[in-house]
């Protein structure tokens, strides 16, 4: 039925020789019958090529007709008890509806409206039923478990099922969207909030499809590298047709086809509605998505019509019904389900006398009950069965449904259904009657949840089906069963030692050395996942190409142009590097897949994703937030960091705020190290926390491309480095000399070191220089102490780490970084009382130039640090204010220079 496009029938009215047309059609049918579809496909391709060679314009279409892909005789029959499944589905619909309506009747004085959605689950309950009952495996000794990316707005339906299974209590359902007291259910799928239930956060629409593609690829990667057997696992992704407008939803479908991810199944719930109205009122979203996915190389299965349409379509000998199906736009299809059978008879079948005659013997109720494919359990099962058996391509199921199915006049097919959270007593009664829920009228006002007795056929069936599939879903593993011991810091001694005289390196080089050393570790080396976005040569990592190879499922089918070089570009079926190309969202999605592997695969992996720091949190911040929600563990490395450290690149590349963005994610631990030993200490400690202790944190380090001598680790400062601050250079000079404390991080710490020399030589001021690898960690520590003191007023106050460090070192404080002032200014509240605190930073747009010019422009070089220190001392009455003016003149600084914020 679907092999030929419906517009073929439109051509029939212009057919000048119908007999010849019929002969061609009969010939093709004979080939299909005798030699099979492959031969027919070959002949058609030859005919099309011959037509093109003869200059016949053949417009391309990736579309098939507006009918089901599977013919009725191609459908695998559902082995389940459809009657029992329908009853269970009805109970879940009722409990999901009840949960949402109850949540919006609570505490009217407090607003009363907690939100929730009824219509979304109503539209795909049949799809979930087929999956949970027949297809979705839980993790067990024989199966690694299928991974489910569940459409966020349908969470009430998933909770309703878990309630029947006995995994959630009635008290938890009553506390839907009431989590503060610790006994409620999260609004949407959030692993952070329900760590043993939800696996993937999906309600930031578009991220689910994107992350799932890279998750499926990561399963293939693990299998290819022999780390885990993932052959029988599937990744199922549920998303709405409106969600596909998010650029992330379709942005990576080419990769899925290119890498032949036949373990990936998209199920797009085509209820034709988004939040406000139709997805494509004037068009056909199913046809549009079919062309997108088929054109990208996916296997596309369309499920549009239910079983009771089959006989009508079989009788459609002249194509009149197919033509109307194709010509009717989605806005009209939505209207049909918002009205009744008489309306459908007139406005759909009534468009052609032939189709009107086809339904002449059907009542209006019969016409109304002509279901869409997504509400037919047999059709859904058959589509799923075909999808799981398909090899060599990812599959997308385009399944047509009705938003708010079963809600009747309260929302079914209406533009307002997404916002329908409250139902009248009459609406509730109609819902009960529609789904035959055994609750008497006398109880309806209480909206009780319904759960059959455990010994009923329905409940036995419910548990039997999940037992057959290995257990209950969704379910999330919180820790891996395996254990590793992280190499001691001594293993990384070449990085923690001072560089040889005359030798200069960057912190990026220090990172690469650390990574290379870790790759050599016998136990952890194979678990390292280096992730690149086409910048390996920028970061000096091209040496890894030959050493560990770049993963490619096809291997290397060509001879690389640099084959004769030591560091040639090597792709390998078992390669260890994930090279994503110019694709930060893909890099971050691969990082998330690896960083959550302890949970999804029971395999601890250690991802290191390095990229231009400006193109991290700013570009893929929503994915970083999702990583926090998913309790990711791994390293993000922001290379070429800082507003003034990247020579010549300019406004779009120079990063002055990634640490501020990193600080918004509670479980992101961020550092801006200056020296190689700091990089080694921080990363080794991060490994201890994430790998050895399996703590749910991830690390962000900024790396520099500026070369200089490295001083080496001073024993005993390791813990202070981790906490975010240690004394790098103590003040030298007579006790009577004015004293100041210079704080810095990243490349600008070295400007503070130079300022220390100028203060002593030019102004007789002694300065302590403090390396502060993390103002974020210092701020969190201070806030924690302040909070504890607030809530324990009668106890001995706790002292912030900043105050502890500075307490014994008198003098004002000047903090300078290559980031916006608000980064270092976070610790202002924790500076010891009575101290002046000055902050220098890089507020404003970046621009291209040399480092020295940029640091002068942003007023963060050694001269400005000296002036800030003198100004702070003058405010405390230690030096005359005239000295400040003299310093400005001495260093030739312009007092009337434009503020770099506005430059």
Q: Where in the sequence are the language-model features?
A:
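Short alpha-helical segments and helix-capping/turn motifs at coil-helix boundaries
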Residues: 110-114, 126-135, 141-145, 196-200, ...
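Thiamine diphosphate
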Residues: 179-201, 207, 221-232, 250-452, ...
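N-terminal amphipathic, basic-rich helices that act as targeting or association modules
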Residues: 2-165, 431, 505-521, 525, ...
């Amino acid at each position: 039925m679907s092999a030929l496009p419906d517009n073929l029938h439109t051509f029939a009215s212009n057919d000048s020789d119908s007999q010849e047309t019929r002969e061609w059609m009969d010939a093709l049918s004979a080939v299909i019958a005798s030699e099979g579809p492959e031969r027919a496909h070959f002949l058609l391709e030859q005919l099309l090529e011959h037509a093109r060679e003869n200059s016949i314009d053949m417009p391309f279409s990736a579309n098939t007709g507006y009918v089901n892909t599977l013919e009725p005789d191609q459908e695998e029959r559902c082995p389940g008890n459809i009657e029992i499944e329908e009853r269970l589905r009805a109970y879940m619909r009722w409990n999901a509806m009840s949960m949402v309506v109850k949540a919006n009747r609570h505490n009217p004085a407090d607003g009363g409206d907690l939100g929730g959605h009824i219509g979304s689950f109503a539209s795909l309950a049949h799809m979930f039923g087929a999956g949970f009952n027949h297809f979705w495996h839980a993790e067990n000794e024989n199966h690694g478990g299928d991974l489910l990316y569940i459409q966020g707005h349908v969470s009430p339906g998933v909770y309703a099922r878990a309630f029947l299974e006995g995994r959630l209590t009635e008290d938890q359902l009553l506390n839907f969207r009431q989590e503060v007291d610790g006994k409620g259910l999260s609004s949407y799928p959030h692993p952070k909030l329900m760590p043993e239930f939800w696996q993937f956060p999906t309600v930031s629409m578009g991220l689910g499809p994107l992350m799932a593609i890279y998750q499926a690829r990561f399963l293939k990667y693990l299998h290819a590298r022999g780390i885990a057997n993932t052959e029988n696992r599937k990744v199922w992704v549920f998303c709405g047709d409106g969600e596909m407008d998010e650029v992330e939803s379709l942005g990576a479908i080419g990769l899925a086809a290119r890498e032949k991810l036949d373990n990936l199944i998209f199920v797009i719930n085509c209820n034709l509605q988004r939040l406000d109205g139709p997805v494509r009122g004037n068009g056909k979203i199913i046809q549009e998505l079919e062309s997108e996915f088929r054109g990208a190389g996916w296997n596309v299965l369309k499920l549009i019509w239910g079983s009771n349409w089959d006989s009508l379509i079989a009788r459609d000998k002249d194509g009149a019904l197919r033509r109307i199906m194709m010509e009717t736009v989605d806005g009209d299809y939505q209207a049909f389900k918002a009205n009744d059978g008489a309306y459908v008879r007139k406005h759909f079948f009534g468009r052609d006398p032939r189709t009107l005659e086809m339904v002449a013997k059907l009542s209006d109720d019969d016409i109304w009950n002509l279901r869409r494919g997504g509400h037919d359990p047999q059709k859904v099962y058959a589509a799923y069965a075909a999808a799981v058996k398909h090899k060599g391509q990812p599959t997308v199921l385009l399944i047509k449904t009705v938003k708010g199915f079963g809600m009747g006049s309260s929302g079914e097919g209406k533009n307002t259904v997404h916002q329908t959270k409250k139902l009248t007593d009459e609406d509730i009664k109609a819902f009960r009657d529609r789904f035959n829920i055994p609750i008497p009228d006398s109880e309806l006002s209480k909206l009780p949840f319904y759960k059959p007795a455990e010994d009923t056929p329905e409940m036995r069936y419910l548990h039997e089906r999940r037992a057959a599939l290995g257990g209950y879903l969704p379910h999330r593993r919180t820790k891996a069963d395996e254990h590793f011991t992280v190499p001691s810091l001594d293993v990384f001694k070449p990085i923690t030692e001072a560089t040889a005289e005359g030798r200069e390196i960057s912190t990026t080089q220090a990172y690469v050395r650390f990574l290379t050393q870790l790759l050599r570790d016998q136990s952890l080396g194979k678990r390292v996942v280096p992730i690149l976005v086409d910048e390996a040569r920028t970061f000096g990592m091209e040496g890894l190409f030959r050493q560990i190879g770049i993963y490619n499922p096809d291997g290397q089918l060509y001879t690389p142009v640099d084959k004769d070089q030591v560091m040639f570009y090597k792709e390998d079926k078992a390669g260890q590097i994930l090279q994503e190309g110019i694709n930060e969202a893909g890099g971050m999605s691969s990082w998330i897949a690896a960083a959550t592997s302890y949970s999804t695969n029971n395999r601890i992996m250690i991802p290191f994703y390095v990229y231009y720091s400006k193109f991290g949190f700013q570009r893929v911040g929503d994915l970083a937030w999702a990583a926090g929600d998913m309790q990711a563990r791994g390293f993000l490395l922001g290379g070429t960091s800082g507003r003034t450290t990247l020579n010549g690149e300019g406004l779009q590349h120079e990063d002055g705020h990634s640490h501020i963005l990193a600080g918004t994610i509670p479980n992101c631990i961020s550092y801006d190290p200056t020296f190689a030993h700091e990089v080694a200490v921080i990363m080794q400690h991060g490994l201890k926390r994430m790998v050895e202790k399996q703590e749910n944190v991830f690390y962000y380090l900024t790396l520099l491309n500026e070369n200089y001598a490295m001083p080496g680790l001073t024993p005993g400062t390791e813990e202070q480095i981790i906490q975010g601050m240690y004394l790098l250079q103590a003040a030298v000079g007579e006790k009577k000399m004015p004293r100041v404390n210079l704080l810095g991080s990243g490349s600008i710490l070295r400007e503070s070191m130079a300022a220390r020399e100028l203060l002593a030589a030019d102004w007789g001021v002694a300065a302590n220089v403090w390396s502060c690898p993390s103002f974020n960690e210092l701020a969190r520590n201070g806030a924690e102490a302040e909070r504890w003191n607030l809530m324990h007023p009668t106890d001995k106050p706790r002292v912030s780490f900043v105050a502890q460090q500075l307490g014994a070192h008198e003098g004002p404080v000047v903090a300078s970084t290559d980031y916006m002032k608000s980064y270092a200014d976070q610790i202002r509240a924790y500076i010891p009382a009575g101290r002046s605190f000055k902050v220098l930073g890089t507020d404003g747009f970046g621009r291209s130039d040399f480092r020295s010019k940029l640091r002068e422009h942003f007023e963060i070089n050694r001269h400005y640090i000296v002036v800030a220190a003198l100004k702070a001392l003058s405010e405390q009455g230690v030096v005359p204010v005239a000295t400040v003016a003299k310093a400005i003149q001495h260093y030739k600084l312009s007092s009337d220079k434009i503020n770099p914020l506005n430059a």
